[in-house]
């Protein structure tokens, strides 16, 4: 029950952050879903960072990891909005923009996870004497 509460609290935090930052970022862009792309990229970076710290250093307890990854980042990032916005671009006959959105979201998210892992490895090596 405690873990479910942690996920719920994390979800509240993540969803609120997504609403505030996603809207703020998107306000400058009308024709392309930059807000969702940015949110998903940032979330992917932090997921890579947290998971590698958690998996290789045991830096986070299981409950902390669940709170951060499933709760906060799960609500912060948004696959459903990405799908909806991509379909809207396609529905509006903006095939090129839709393609750019799909490819850039997948590539940026994967690169961000890799960057998060790289930062975790670097910080770990510098502060903690390297990964196990």
UniProtKB/Swiss-Prot annotation:
It catalyses: fluoride(in) = fluoride(out). Its main location: membrane. GO terms for biological process: cellular detoxification of fluoride. The chain crosses the membrane at residues 4-24, 32-52, 66-86, 95-115. One of its GO terms (molecular function) is metal ion binding. Na(+) is not transported, but it plays an essential structural role and its presence is essential for fluoride channel function. Na(+) binds at residues 74, 77. Keywords: Cell membrane, Ion channel, Ion transport, Membrane, Metal-binding, Sodium, Transmembrane, Transmembrane helix, Transport. GO terms for cellular component: plasma membrane. InterPro entries: FluC. It is a multi-pass membrane protein. It is found in: Cell membrane. Fluoride-specific ion channel. Important for reducing fluoride concentration in the cell, thus reducing its toxicity. Belongs to the fluoride channel Fluc/FEX (TC 1.A.43) family. NCBIfam families: crcB. HAMAP family: FluC (MF_00454). This is Fluoride-specific ion channel FluC 3. It comes from Methanosarcina barkeri (strain Fusaro / DSM 804).
């Amino acid at each position: 029950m405690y873990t479910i509460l942690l996920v719920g609290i994390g979800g509240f935090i993540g969803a609120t952050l997504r609403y505030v930052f996603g809207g703020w970022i998107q306000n400058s862009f009308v024709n392309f879903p930059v807000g969702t792309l940015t949110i998903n990229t940032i979330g992917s970076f932090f997921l890579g960072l947290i998971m590698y710290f958690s998996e290789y250093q045991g830096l986070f307890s299981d409950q902390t990891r669940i709170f951060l990854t499933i709760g906060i980042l799960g609500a912060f990032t948004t696959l459903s909005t990405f799908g909806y916005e991509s379909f809207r671009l396609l529905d509006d006959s903006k095939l090129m923009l839709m393609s750019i959105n799909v490819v850039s979201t997948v590539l940026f998210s994967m690169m961000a996870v890799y960057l998060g892992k790289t930062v975790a490895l670097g910080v770990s090596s510098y502060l903690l004497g390297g990964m196990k």
